[in-house]
């Protein structure tokens, strides 16, 4: 038999199973090799299968901000599913430069929202897919400079929405246009250092109001925004007022489908420094019933001596803490509240520059990241954001809202 003429035809189901185990970037490359593969790998059935397989291997997503270089870099690593894992390797995905403003980003279902990125002398709101680097710009709105905005996902209509103060923009609705929402609510100011959290189609974020007199003249409240109905509710959060001077200590998390608030502090335990973690869980959102848990983490010299933040809570219930700045070695910590165990995993691969003290970057980490091919195929996202620094004024139309393509 002439092996050069040998033609082996694989069943379509087998092709789907093989490719569903690959990274999304590899799938994108194989789509270009033949019309048959492109048809299979762009089908709705394969997109659903890929998402199902990807959900079984969640990752940690890292967005690293380098102030000195005006640059964001995006990495991901396997999320620990084995108590005996000691290290994990990063995969670099994309980056963008161009006078990055020191504003915190917002994350929702695989996309990142940046409220102020300077591109070609223009301040632009940018939504970016950190894996592919594809992005789009949104119309700029007149608002309070302290406002930061959020990106949220509507699980009912399967659409993303951008939300800033009382303005809402729906992606996938044709023209990208902000709508103003009149809200009968107390005068409040969002805590700009807090990213908020979206849980089952409801956005929660921390804010301050002056309605109730306190020793500081302010009190905390939590704003609750239903993404589908676009209705607001307000949750009394005065129990956190002793953190008013430093709200950065508080993190909102998705704790097993319920709103959680965490606060970490180093304490002296028998002459040794250790970390105390407080967790409040909103057990009943209608009755506003909170349950508080206090954990003293197992002794860990690295954790007790470094700056860290709470990245979130995994679907399996592990509370993930990560070092706040890149360095070598860099660690992520998994605390299991039920077993009272603390797992330390070294994250390798930020690169020599980011690991230098003088060039370190601030790390924003997100748990349970899952690759979704439908995000990679979104026509509204344009060319790679890594190229924005090279845009000249005559190419500025690439990021202007009126020139954004049709929406899927």
Swiss-Prot record:
Domain of life: Eukaryota
Coiled-coil annotated spans: none
SMART domains in the cross-refs: FBOX
Domain F-box: 4-53
InterPro entries (alphabetical): F-box-assoc_dom_typ3, F-box-assoc_interact_dom, F-box-like_dom_sf, F-box_dom
Name used for this protein in its record: F-box protein At3g57580
The organism of origin for this protein: Arabidopsis thaliana
């Amino acid at each position: 038999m002439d092996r050069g003429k040998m033609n082996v035809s694989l069943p379509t189901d087998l092709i789907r199973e093989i490719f569903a185990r690959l990274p999304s970037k590899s799938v994108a490359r194989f789509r270009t090799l033949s019309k048959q593969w492109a048809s299979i790998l762009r089908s709705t059935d394969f997109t659903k299968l890929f998402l199902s397989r990807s959900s079984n291997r969640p990752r940690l997503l890292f967005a690293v901000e380098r102030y000195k270089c005006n640059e964001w870099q995006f990495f991901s690593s396997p999320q620990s599913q084995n108590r005996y894992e000691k290290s994990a390797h990063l995969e670099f995905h994309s980056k963008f430069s161009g006078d990055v403003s020191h504003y915190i980003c917002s994350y929702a279902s695989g996309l990142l929202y940046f409220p102020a990125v300077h591109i070609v002398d223009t301040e632009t709101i940018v939504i970016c897919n950190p894996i592919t680097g594809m992005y789009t710009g949104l119309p700029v709105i007149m608002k309070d400079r302290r406002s930061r905005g959020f990106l949220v996902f509507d699980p009912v209509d399967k659409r993303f929405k951008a939300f800033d103060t009382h303005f809402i923009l729906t992606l996938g609705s044709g023209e990208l246009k902000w709508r103003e929402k009149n809200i009968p609510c107390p005068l409040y100011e969002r805590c700009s250092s807090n990213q908020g959290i979206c849980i089952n189609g409801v956005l929660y974020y921390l804010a301050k109001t002056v309605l109730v007199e306190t020793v500081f003249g302010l009190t905390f409240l939590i704003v609750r925004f239903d993404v589908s109905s676009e209705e607001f509710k307000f949750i009394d959060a005065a129990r956190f007022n002793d953190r008013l001077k430093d709200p950065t200590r508080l993190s909102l998390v998705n704790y097993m489908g319920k709103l959680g608030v965490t606060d970490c502090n180093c304490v002296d335990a028998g002459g040794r420094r250790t970390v105390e973690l407080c967790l409040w869980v909103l057990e009943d959102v209608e009755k506003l019933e909170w349950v508080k848990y206090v954990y003293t983490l197992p002794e860990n010299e690295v954790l007790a001596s470094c700056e860290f933040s709470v990245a979130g809570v995994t679907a399996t219930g592990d509370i993930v803490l990560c070092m706040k700045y890149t360095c070598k070695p860099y660690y992520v910590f998994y605390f299991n509240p039920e077993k009272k165990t603390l797992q330390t995993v070294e994250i390798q691969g930020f690169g020599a520059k980011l690991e230098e003290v003088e060039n370190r970057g601030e790390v924003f980490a997100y748990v349970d990241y899952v690759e979704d091919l439908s995000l990679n195929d979104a026509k509204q996202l344009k060319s790679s954001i890594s190229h924005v620094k090279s845009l000249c004024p005559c190419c500025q139309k690439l990021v202007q809202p009126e020139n954004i393509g049709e929406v899927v």
